[in-house]
Amino acid sequence: MRNKICKELNNTDIGKLVNLCGWVDRRRDHGGVIFIDLRDHSGFLQITINPDDGAALFKQAETLRNETVIMVSGIINERPKDSINTNLSTGELELKVKDLQILNQIKKNLPFPVSIHDYENTKEELRLKYRYLDLRRGKLLENLKTRHKIIKVAREFLDNFGFTEVETPLLTKSTPEGARDFLVPARLSNGEFFALPQSPQLFKQLLMVGGLDKYYQIAKCFRDEDLRADRQPEFTQLDIEMSFISEEEIISFNESLIKKIWKEVLNIKFNNAFPRMSWQEAMDNYGTDRPDTRYQMLLKDLGGILGDIGFNIFTKAIKSGGYIKSITVKGGNSSISNVRIKPGGDIFQVAKDAGAGGLAFIRVKGDELETIGAIKNNLSEEHIADILKITEAKDGDLILLGAGDKLIVNQSLDRVRQYIAKDLNLIDKSKWNFLWVTDFPMFERNEEENRYEALHHPFCSPKNIKSKDSENLKKEIESSTANAYDLVLNGLELGGGSLRIHEANLQREVLKMVGLTDKEIDEKFGFLIEALEMGAPPHGGIAFGLDRITMLIIGTDSIRETIAFPKNQQAKCLLTNAPSNVSESQLKELDIEITIDE
């Protein structure tokens, strides 16, 4: 049907007969000549139709509406100099039409304009409902092509290092991995269910047990969890696993992979190794294990200074084993008013939404500290000097303080730090601040259920374990950090991984420590334990979030802009209206009865 696409045309095509297919982007009638901007997936070309070319052809062109699908044949001409469009690669050319065929006439009014000339901000819900029209606008198509290039670069890199791409099952066993599983009823096994995988974790480990040595997969994963801008119920991982490998080797290799992607896709080269930071250092200084290091405002511990000044909130925080921490906003006295950090203010609300009761604040004015009387009246000159030294605050700076439970103080000051950095334009958006976070704890304590929870997952190998007997082994695991590592970019986790447990007794002990009985271990993970008893090699790996990598590379705030047909924030597909009801006969075949709470 066509022998060229728009972007292929250049001055060497002048005088040639070409066939093009595409959409009418817009039509203009000027002085008896019809000008049409033809759009295909690659770009635009102006086509012209003159009454002298034939009355029937001209009349047909007059009927064309935007988004009509056409095929045109004609001669490529050079545009008159006064009509050259320097914004287009084909802006010096036009097609003088000899023949026009309407392949599909537009029959419905469009829900929103597609043409770049009529572009308007359209509500995302409408864009998701008519995703095929949104794709035609071009930006989304470019995003998908960028995503394709990222995958292509990764595949070539891994192939060159001897990796084998293997597909793992999408219908698998429900195992506790943190989020809820999507369950699939098994018709041939009454009352039993498959689960869609949250990750290929166990299968890729079993591939290592099977001797594959180096594996990767562009893996679809599923988690039934509450959504936000950078989450989807189904998402894609670049999943990697290797045998006979150290933590250092995994980090070094995957850093090279990420550098390769950035070089090939963005032409950005990183000469130095990515910096590293322990989990504890990240939590102490940033309040999060995903720190954005493009700006300052580090958290500072003031518990040793303010814990005994007699201010009840501070005293209570320290006595209960909590924190008093601060962040310093440079020039904050002039940029942030009291209204914003008191109840009802936007900054106060950010802290409250993160679990804090509120924020205390100190304004530095010369050598004086201005704050509420209950704090100020109990500060000695030594207190003031120590506060200024630790916070590095100067005249005109604002010190914000959080006090209470360690987790809540870290979480609330982290959120406030991020919010203020955006609000005051403190973030250099040209920076790519990669960071490896290492030495994660093996567990975090679930006080409500009085048990441990794995911080990454219960298949991470603890560091420096020597004991073989169960009691000493448990003590060593409790005090150990994990052979785990995350790659963070500008405050977002790009990927995470670990060395895996490859000894059956150690794996069983870790699973028991997260609350599983021996019976539950055998029921849920018996196949893994058995495999580890049959000569499993030391192995480890990492999984990168492909959607998030693409999101950062194309410079958007939502991974929905990187996916052809995403779900909305209620996990619904507005295009197909999924999920949807199914017929009674389908449910009957599965022996499923639905009851809905009133």
Curated annotation (Swiss-Prot):
Keywords: Aminoacyl-tRNA synthetase, ATP-binding, Cytoplasm, Ligase, Nucleotide-binding, Protein biosynthesis. The keyword tRNA-binding does not apply. The record marks H30 as: Important for tRNA non-discrimination. InterPro entries: Aa-tRNA-synt_II, aa-tRNA-synth_II, aa-tRNA-synth_II/BPL/LPL, Asp-tRNA-ligase_1, Asp-tRNA-ligase_1_N, Asp/Asn-tRNA-synth_IIb, AspRS_core, GAD-like_sf. Aspartyl-tRNA synthetase with relaxed tRNA specificity since it is able to aspartylate not only its cognate tRNA(Asp) but also tRNA(Asn). Reaction proceeds in two steps: L-aspartate is first activated by ATP to form Asp-AMP and then transferred to the acceptor end of tRNA(Asp/Asn). Belongs to the class-II aminoacyl-tRNA synthetase family. Type 1 subfamily. This is Aspartate--tRNA(Asp/Asn) ligase. It comes from Prochlorococcus marinus (strain MIT 9301).
